[in-house]
Curated annotation (Swiss-Prot):
Record function comment: Blocks mouse voltage-gated potassium channels Kv1.3/KCNA3 (IC(50)=0.3-30 nM), when the channel is expressed in Jurkat T cells or in HEK293 cells. Also shows a weaker inhibition on mKv1.2/KCNA2 (IC(50)=56.9 nM) and mKv1.1/KCNA1 (IC(50)=485 nM). Probably through the inhibition of both Kv1.2/KCNA2 and Kv1.3/KCNA3, the toxin also reduces the free calcium concentration in Jurkat T cells, inhibits the activation of Jurkat T cells and reduces the release of inflammatory cytokines interleukin-2, showing a strong immunosuppressant effect.
Keyword Signal applies: yes
Signal peptide residue numbers: 1-18
Source taxonomy: Eukaryota, Metazoa, Ecdysozoa, Arthropoda, Chelicerata
Species of the source: Scorpiops pococki
Homology family: Belongs to the short scorpion toxin superfamily. Potassium channel inhibitor family. Alpha-KTx 12 subfamily.
Protein name stated in the entry: Potassium channel toxin alpha-KTX 12 Sp2
Length: 55
C-alpha cells in the first residue's frame, strides 16, 4: 500500500515539474504565455490549450 502512495506522489511531482518544459498554458488570444526553451525551440504553438515547442 505504501509503495502505491509513493508512486502516485512521484507521478504527480513529475507531471507538475514536467508540464512547464512542454510549454506554458496558452493565453486567451491563443498565444504562448512564456518563451519556449524546451528542445532548443524559442517559439511555441498552441495545441489543446498548451504551448508546444518548435525550433
Amino acid at each position: 500500500m505504501r509503495l502505491a502512495i509513493i508512486l502516485l506522489l512521484m507521478t504527480t511531482i513529475v507531471l507538475t515539474i514536467g508540464s512547464p518544459l512542454h510549454g506554458a498554458k496558452c493565453s486567451s488570444s491563443n498565444q504562448c504565455t512564456r518563451p519556449c526553451r524546451y528542445g532548443g525551440g524559442t517559439h511555441g504553438k498552441c495545441m489543446n490549450g498548451r504551448c508546444r515547442c518548435y525550433g
